[in-house]
């Protein structure tokens, strides 16, 4: 392929697909993968199912673009995480190295080497990273300094938010006409007497608005849309009415099926219909009649009447009991009727809430503006601010927008299903309208809590499917990860569960997983999926297993441990090939306890934010609080009770009785002082042993308090560690490595706190307490994870990963639906819906009542609530899909249930091969969904076995123990012929030693060397030429230097050298380099201010302005290559073995007939000849590498010396 070769036509792609299909390759690309790699000329959406090779497609597409002459820095490539970007860059780099090694075309080699250099500057990363870069370069359009910082600490954000909220709140309260505002605050305060509840409402609205493309526009134009639109029965959307009618029919269907069950008494012994059956038949008839003829009987205007009649028709309870089992037949319908039943009254009072919402709208806008102003003053912003700045710049500056659109050949985005509207707007502005390449899978959109909107993907999917002229839709269905047992059960579950109404996409042939290779299609019956249910029937009442909470039980974990032991012992499955997936990071202690009991190594994925709540850190924080203020009773007692001093409850009680007066309450420290002086009320309670401990404690605390006045926090913390051996003590406790890492991090964080300009123990404690007040924490310190252990991680964390065996735990846990009861519910299209507290006193006509407050769900709230409910259930469905598709070989679903109840479960209604919508909406756990599917479609093979596990199956004998196959049993030693074996071993070792000696030089020869390592090899040769080489080891003359008490950090020469090289690399090359260009490049250098101050900018300016080499670089900057990596094969003279020399060349100019090589040096020197001699061999090596690469014999070599008193450019080949 030539680098100027055009892109493939559809006909050429078709031929390539046919050739690939007929080829004898072991791993063939699918036709859809080929289409995704080579299609061009229009927007492309790739719907890539789990394990379909989307990363492979992206890498191959990028490489194809590069090979066709599109430089990698002309591609915009967005990834969801920094880690994904790093992995993508590594794959591209590997592909480029392979291409360089395989080609013999020198021109192509040079071009691909250029691409390797350009890769580090290419826009491959997260949207946040790109937005920062754009605002850094063009923030001047909005008046933003390029030296802004990102507020990444949530605690810092919350502290600033609280301060801004307080100021805005006081402004609104101080207004003369504040009646509506006070009523607004009271509406959300409930029983609280402060403004905290209202502040939470404002926070949630602000956060939601930030995910939109234009927050201020959304707040001004959309925020009140629903409140102004839905004010009467006629405004109720058709889909809401349709959902109610469908629920009525579904309830009638379920009731009809229930009356046909064995055990339901339809007739009496006399043969007459039972009263219950007659009543149920009437219900069935009425439900069918009213639903079928809704328009003629009621219509929207009489919806309230229908709700009243349904309430009268249905029983008060939701269940019907048949043969001792309860069936919640009426639950779904009754839940829907709650809002409709009183809708007429709600609509009458709802209009009162609109003035309050207008005040709320104004307040949130004021808060948003004030919060942004506060951040502008600090020149510190959140990620969302930077993204909005980037959008604003591109919208306000057409020249900048057009420059980006003209620069990018293609705008590529990975994990497109997890984009929010802010990110989508930024991508639209960067694209020219027909050069977008989007890869994702709506079935794996699980980040709604980050305001991701899967409908962005879904709308494009539908548009491109219906209108190919708008863009190309490519489906990647083949899965190359999982065996057929995993694929089959996944398809069986989701084809009966997921559709457009719930799941937001229909799981049909377009989305079902297909095995991508013949090996995957081979059947392994032992890997058939299993639903393992711990039977709660046998659990004793009051025990954990009998509880109805959502926590995982010890029984569930024990059955998992039993299966893992079986896999390890019998199938030789390594622990690291097994992963446990849970829904959240917390409340997993039972898993660790049970696994520890059976000796199964387990490692949890990091990321928990409970650092400040770890025991060892809490002890240290209470110690610091006590040093700061001994009158803090809680902290002081906690310190005394801690392992550092080990006062027990009895001793603390004796001290607490030592008040000097019963009239005035005293702090515990005062009682401690009274105890020491013998002046308490009961001095006889303080024995000699306790007195000794008190004296030791008091002396130590006083010593620490005095030390804290004169020393840093870092030194104080380490003094506490050393004085009481606390750092050593935690090393003997469980999770010792983590505990010590946490304590060490506390000292480091305290030091960073003081380094940032804040001083003093009091301020540090205040900062920590503010973090805890805002319900925030700091991330746990990461420690090295054991390699051979079972993994425990959340489903969210597992996305994109794959494991041989997957256990999805707590399968019966109910979905978190708390958001459906929140005071407000926000919708991107309809705005806000609220619970309004209305005074309904006049409805009762009781003059004795001052007021009667009733909280009612307004119609916009109810509509937003229904949409949120569907969105939440849809995301849970996708979460299950992600979890199941992580497995390569086998998936286990683990929960708990009553065997008796499950076996008596009847089939749910189904429609078009799926569970009925009402059933799917009613069921609120993964387990409920799956059991409904198995009951409803029991006659079909669902590729999963349901198995109950009793306590009798989980005894210590039944579970078993891990067997180690590596231990040598004593019985195996009796026939051991030691003398003969040892002699044979010694003989073998002797032969190996002789062989090693004969090839000693080759063994010691490194495979890869750097030029600086080679320089030491040349030193003996340089010595023979009259150059003195200092004998090793070199001993410096002893001298006494005064200690440096300054706070300035020492700047190492190596730091200056590295920063200079980075500066010379960052200077934008042009025909005329100005001082401004150099100053701008200096700002981009990633070094401390102290290091930058040591850079001699005058010499850099003089280099380009006065030297011939500097002028040559500017004149021919198109031929300039900087920071160029190279590799050359050399032969060792002693061993005659080959080795690779690798390095980085500062720069060179490439002409047709010559190469101009140069290198910057910051070494101190007296005579330039010293450095010429020192670096001659290194430069010769660079020249040899360039000459071999380009086939050009003439290479001019220059050293640019910046370490002397004057700038000097010397040529080495003269």
Swiss-Prot record:
Record's keyword annotation contains Nuclease: yes
Keyword Ribonucleoprotein found: no
Pfam families in the record: PDDEXK_1, UvrD-helicase, UvrD_C
E.C. number: 3.1.-.-, 5.6.2.4
Catalytic activity reported: Couples ATP hydrolysis with the unwinding of duplex DNA by translocating in the 3'-5' direction; ATP + H2O = ADP + phosphate + H(+)
Needed cofactors: Mg(2+)
Domain of life: Bacteria
Gene Ontology cellular component terms for the protein in this record: cytosol; DNA helicase complex
Domain UvrD-like helicase C-terminal: 512-800
Record-listed ATP binding positions: 48-55
InterPro entries reported for this sequence: AddA (IPR014152), DNA_helicase_UvrD-like_C (IPR014017), DNA_helicase_UvrD/REP (IPR000212), P-loop_NTPase (IPR027417), PDDEXK-like_dom_sf (IPR011604), PDDEXK_AddAB-type (IPR038726), Restrct_endonuc-II-like (IPR011335), UvrD-like_ATP-bd (IPR014016)
Gene Ontology biological-process annotations: double-strand break repair via homologous recombination
Residues of the UvrD-like helicase ATP-binding domain: 27-483
UniProt keyword terms in alphabetical order: ATP-binding, DNA damage, DNA repair, DNA-binding, Exonuclease, Helicase, Hydrolase, Isomerase, Nuclease, Nucleotide-binding
One example GO MF annotation: ATP hydrolysis activity
Function comment: The heterodimer acts as both an ATP-dependent DNA helicase and an ATP-dependent, dual-direction single-stranded exonuclease. Recognizes the chi site generating a DNA molecule suitable for the initiation of homologous recombination. The AddA nuclease domain is required for chi fragment generation; this subunit has the helicase and 3' -> 5' nuclease activities.
Family listed: Belongs to the helicase family. AddA subfamily.
Quaternary organization: Heterodimer of AddA and AddB/RexB.
Name of protein: ATP-dependent helicase/nuclease subunit A
The organism of origin for this protein: Streptococcus equi subsp. zooepidemicus (strain MGCS10565)
Gene (UniProt): addA
């Amino acid at each position: 392929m030539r680098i100027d070769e055009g892109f493939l036509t559809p006909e050429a792609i078709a031929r390539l697909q046919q050739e690939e299909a007929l080829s004898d390759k072991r791993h063939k690309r699918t036709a859809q993968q080929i289409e995704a790699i080579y299609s061009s000329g229009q927007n492309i959406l790739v719907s890539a199912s789990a394990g379909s090779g989307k990363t492979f497609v992206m890498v191959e597409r990028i490489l194809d673009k590069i090979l066709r002459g599109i430089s990698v820095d002309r591609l915009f490539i967005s990834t969801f995480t920094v880690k994904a970007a790093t992995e993508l860059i590594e794959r591209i780099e590997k592909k480029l190295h392979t291409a360089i090694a395989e080609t013999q075309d020198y021109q192509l080699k040079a071009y691909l080497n250029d691409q390797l250099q350009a890769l580090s500057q290419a826009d491959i990363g997260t949207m946040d990273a790109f937005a920062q870069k754009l605002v850094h370069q063009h923030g001047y359009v909005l008046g933003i300094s390029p030296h802004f910082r990102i507020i990444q600490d949530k605690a810092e954000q919350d502290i600033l938010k609280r301060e801004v909220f307080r100021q805005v709140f006081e402004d609104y309260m101080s207004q003369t006409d504040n009646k509506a505002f006070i009523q607004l605050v009271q509406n959300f305060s409930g029983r609280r007497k402060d403004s905290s509840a209202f502040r939470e409402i404002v926070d949630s609205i602000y956060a939601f608005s930030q995910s939109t493309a234009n927050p201020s526009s959304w707040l001004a134009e959309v925020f009140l849309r629903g409140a102004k639109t839905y004010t009467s029965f006629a405004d109720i959307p058709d889909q809401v009415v349709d959902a109610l009618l469908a629920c009525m029919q579904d309830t009638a269907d379920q009731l009809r099926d229930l009356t046909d069950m064995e055990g339901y008494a339809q007739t009496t012994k006399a043969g007459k219909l039972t009263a219950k059956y007659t009543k149920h038949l009437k219900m069935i008839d009425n439900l069918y009649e009213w639903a079928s003829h809704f328009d003629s009987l009621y219509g929207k205007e009489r919806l309230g009447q229908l709700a009243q009649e349904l309430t009268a028709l249905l029983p008060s309870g939701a269940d019907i009991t048949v043969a001792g089992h309860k069936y919640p037949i009426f639950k779904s319908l009754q839940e829907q009727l709650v809002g409709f039943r009183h809708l007429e009254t709600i609509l009458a009072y709802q209009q009162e809430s609109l003035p309050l919402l207008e005040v709320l709208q104004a307040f949130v806008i004021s808060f948003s503006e004030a919060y942004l102003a506060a951040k502008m003053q600090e020149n510190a912003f959140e990620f969302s601010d930077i993204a909005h700045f980037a959008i604003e710049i591109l919208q306000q500056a057409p020249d900048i927008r057009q420059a980006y659109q003209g620069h990018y050949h293609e705008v590529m985005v990975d994990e497109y299903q997890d984009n929010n509207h802010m990110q989508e707007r930024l991508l639209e502005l960067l694209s020219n309208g027909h050069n977008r390449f989007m890869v994702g899978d709506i079935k794996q959109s699980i980040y709604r809590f980050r305001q991701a909107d899967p409908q962005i993907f879904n709308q494009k999917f539908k548009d491109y499917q219906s209108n190919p002229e708008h863009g190309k839709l490519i489906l990647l269905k083949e899965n190359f990860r999982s065996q057929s047992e995993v694929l089959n059960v996944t398809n069986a579950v989701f084809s009966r569960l997921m559709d457009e109404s719930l799941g937001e996409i229909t799981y049909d042939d377009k989305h079902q997983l297909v095995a991508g290779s013949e090996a995957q299609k081979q059947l392994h019956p032992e890997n058939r999926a299993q639903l393992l249910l711990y039977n709660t029937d046998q659990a004793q009442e009051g025990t954990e297993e009998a509880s109805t909470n959502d926590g995982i039980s010890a029984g569930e974990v024990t059955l998992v441990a039993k299966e893992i032991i079986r896999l390890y012992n019998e199938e030789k499955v390594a622990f690291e090939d097994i992963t446990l997936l849970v829904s959240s990071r917390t409340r997993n202690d039972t898993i660790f306890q049970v696994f520890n009991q059976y000796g199964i190594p387990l490692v949890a994925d990091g990321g928990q934010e409970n650092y400040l709540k770890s025991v060892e850190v809490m002890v240290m924080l209470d110690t610091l609080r006590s040093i700061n203020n001994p009158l803090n009773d809680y902290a002081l007692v906690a310190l005394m009770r801690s392992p550092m001093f080990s006062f027990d409850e009895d001793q603390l009680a004796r001290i607490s009785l030592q008040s000097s007066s019963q009239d005035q309450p005293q702090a515990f420290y005062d009682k401690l002082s009274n105890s020491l002086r013998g002046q308490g009320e009961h001095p006889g309670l303080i024995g000699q042993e306790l007195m000794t401990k008190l004296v030791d404690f008091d002396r130590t605390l006083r010593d620490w308090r005095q030390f804290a006045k004169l020393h840093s926090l870092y030194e104080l913390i380490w003094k506490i560690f050393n004085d009481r051996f606390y750092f050593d003590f935690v090393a003997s406790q469980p999770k010792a490595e983590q505990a010590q890492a946490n304590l060490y991090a506390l000292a480091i964080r305290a030091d960073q706190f003081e380094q940032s300009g804040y001083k003093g123990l009091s301020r540090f404690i205040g900062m920590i307490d503010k973090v805890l007040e805002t319900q925030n924490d700091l991330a746990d310190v990461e420690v090295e994870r054991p390699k051979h252990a079972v993994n425990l991680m959340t489903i969210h964390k597992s996305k994109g990963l794959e494991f041989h065996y997957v256990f999805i735990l707590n399968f019966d846990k109910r979905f978190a639906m708390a958001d459906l009861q929140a005071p407000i519910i926000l919708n991107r299209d309809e705005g806000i819906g609220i619970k309004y507290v209305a005074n309904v006193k006049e409805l009762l006509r009781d003059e004795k009542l001052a007021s009667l407050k009733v909280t009612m769900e307004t119609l916009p709230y109810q509509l937003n609530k229904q949409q949120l409910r569907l969105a939440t259930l849809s995301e849970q469905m996708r979460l299950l899909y992600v979890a199941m598709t992580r497995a390569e070989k086998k998936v286990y679903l683990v929960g708990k249930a009553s065997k008796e109840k499950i076996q008596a479960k009847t089939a749910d209604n189904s429609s078009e091969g799926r569970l009925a919508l009402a059933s799917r909406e009613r069921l609120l756990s993964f387990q409920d969904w799956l059991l409904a599917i198995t009951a409803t479609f029991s006659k079909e093979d669902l590729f999963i076995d349901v198995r109950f596990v009793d306590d009798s199956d989980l005894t210590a004998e039944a579970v078993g123990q891990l067997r180690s196959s590596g231990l040598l049993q004593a019985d195996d030693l009796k026939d051991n012929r030691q003398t003969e074996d040892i002699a044979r071993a010694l003989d073998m070792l002797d032969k190996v030693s002789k062989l090693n000696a004969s090839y000693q030089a080759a063994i010691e020869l490194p495979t890869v060397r750097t030029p600086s390592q080679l320089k030491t090899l040349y030193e003996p040769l340089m010595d023979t030429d009259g150059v003195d080489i200092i004998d090793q080891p070199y001993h410096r003359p002893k001298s006494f230097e005064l200690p440096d008490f300054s706070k300035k950090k020492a700047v190492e020469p190596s730091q200056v050298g590295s920063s200079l090289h980075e500066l010379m690399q960052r200077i934008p090359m042009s025909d005329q380099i100005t001082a401004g260009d150099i100053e701008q490049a200096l700002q981009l250098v990633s070094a401390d201010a102290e290091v930058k101050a040591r850079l001699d900018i005058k010499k850099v300016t003089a280099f380009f302005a006065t030297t011939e080499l500097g002028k040559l670089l500017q004149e021919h900057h198109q031929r300039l290559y900087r920071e160029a990596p190279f590799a050359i094969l050399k032969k060792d003279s002693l061993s005659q073995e080959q080795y690779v020399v690798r390095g980085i060349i500062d720069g060179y100019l490439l002409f047709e007939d010559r190469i101009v090589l140069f290198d910057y040096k910051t070494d101190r020197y007296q005579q330039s000849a010293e450095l010429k001699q020192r670096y001659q061999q290194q430069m010769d090596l660079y020249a040899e590498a360039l000459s071999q690469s380009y086939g050009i014999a003439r290479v001019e070599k220059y050293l640019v010396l910046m370490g002397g008193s004057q700038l000097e450019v010397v040529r080495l080949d003269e």
